[in-house]
Amino acid sequence: MRSFMTVTVFGLLASSPAFANDDALVADAQAILQTFKTQGKINKFLTTASGYAVFPTIAKGGLIVGGAGGDGVLFVGGKPVGTANMGQASIGLQLGGQTYSEIIFFENPSTLSDFKNNHFQLDAQATAVAISAGASADANYTRGVAVVTMTKAGLMGEASVGGQKFTFHPFTGSAAKH
């Protein structure tokens, strides 16, 4: 009986509405978006992109073998439409750890659709434009995507966004009212 109660309690906790966490993630994404707006030239992308994914915090670390991951929010028409998970694994010369924020701009409906249908990843040649305090960065679209990043903390002896894979989760029900 005790194990049945434990399973029931964990089941209820696991099935609680996820949108409470989604609300916090959306708030974090909107705050980071404002920081990017004041630190660099992203406004041109905000007005022309079919959509954009904002990852407030991506943690990355490695010692020859490395990995990175984080959660973000997809915006279409300036409104949050779902969450996304990013994962990246790499092998090669790398040492250290860092956290950073990332925004991926989708130039056209085709690349946005690929992202929403989980057919999107940044290839090995993908590069990001780093935005730092007080400096402006000029990013451009490549293959329908522009990526900008901003380091939050840490130092990493390797900096690529290639190989990032994404999984999109649309908001449903009351969570869709963000």
Please give the residue ranges for each predicted region.
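Sec/Tat signal peptide C-region and signal peptidase I cleavage site
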Residues: 16-20
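Small-residue-enriched, tightly packed secondary-structure blocks
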Residues: 21-178
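Bacterial N-terminal signal peptides
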Residues: 6-15
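Positively charged n-region of N-terminal signal peptides that target proteins for export
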Residues: 1-4
